[in-house]
Amino acid sequence: MLRRSLVLFAALAAILAPSAAATRHASAFPVTIHAANGDVVVKTRPTRIISLSPTGTEDLFAVGAGSQVIAVDNDSDYPKGVPSTSLSGYTPNVEAIAGYKPDLVVVSNDIDNVVASLQKIGITVLLEPAADNLAQAYDEIRQLGSATGNVPQATKVVSGMEKAMTKILRSVPKAQRHQTVYHELDPTYYSATSSTFIGRIYKLFGFKNIADAADTTHSGYPQLSAEYIVASSPDIVVLADSVCCAQTAASVAARPGWSGISAVKHHRVIAVNDSVASRWGPRIVDFARAIAAVARKK
């Protein structure tokens, strides 16, 4: 009899658990998110989310809101199996977006005043722009966790990232923290300075970015010359054009005059996934880990 009662209790608990979780999520609303487009009130837990931001998509799935996402833009390619569509974050079509009947739209740019246009027809929008640093990246993850009713998981994600980054940064000996770095965006030598998000990651390691001195317009993304790069002889070369443009350590070594560069001679040329290097979501930890591994090479 006791055994049967325990079985019935367990079965009842299993049935009630989803309901209890739903109630717990619902009780967190309404919630006010202090986003880039002002204080946004999310009245109820969203179940029809559209993400027009590749980083936003990664953040949403990381915090456990994947099942709440019904559509993502055509540049969102991670994680595997995201509900890809022809929607664009760069040329947003308000009518097409509205056709999905979303209760929350996440964007990283307010192109063509898409935020106001969507809000005008009653759609809640969160503007989560490109982060300038890790602190901002963490804040956006927390905001999306709050906006979707996934605060515990968002907190866990951020905590995990913070701990991982601390460990990764400490893994590089002090003697190797003063290396010079060249971050390549494309084969025409566009780069990123220390004023950019990715540049600040290098700065955390203590690296000196060769693009800084060449950024005369202070754009953050100067175009360098082959001669300048060769003369600078960076200790580390990071290829963020490996997917788009098939650049590799071998192709870099084959460039005229590049075989004498410190990074080439000491095998510190690394090809990274373009998407990972251009986003500010959870996978930035993977990027930092790869950079640390190259930096430790003697």
Regions picked out by a protein language model, each given a short descriptive name:
Residues 2-5, 17-55, 152-183, 293-298:
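Bacterial Sec-exported substrate-binding components of ABC uptake systems
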Residues 35-37, 85-95, 215-226:
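Short helix-initiation/N-cap motifs at beta->coil->alpha
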Residues 46, 93-107, 123, 225-240:
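Proline-aspartate-enriched helix->loop->beta-strand connector
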Residues 48-110, 207-210:
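A short, structured surface patch at a secondary-structure boundary
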Residues 75-80, 112-143, 147, 151:
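Flexible loop/hinge segments that line or gate small-molecule binding clefts
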Residues 113, 136-137, 141-146, 155, ...:
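Structured C-terminal subdomain patch of bacterial secreted/periplasmic proteins
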Residues 128-143, 147, 176-201, 245-247:
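Extracytoplasmic ligand-binding site segments that recognize negatively charged/polar headgroups
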Residues 195-220, 271:
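His/Asp/Glu-enriched short active-site or ligand-binding loop at hydrolase and phosphoryl-transfer sites
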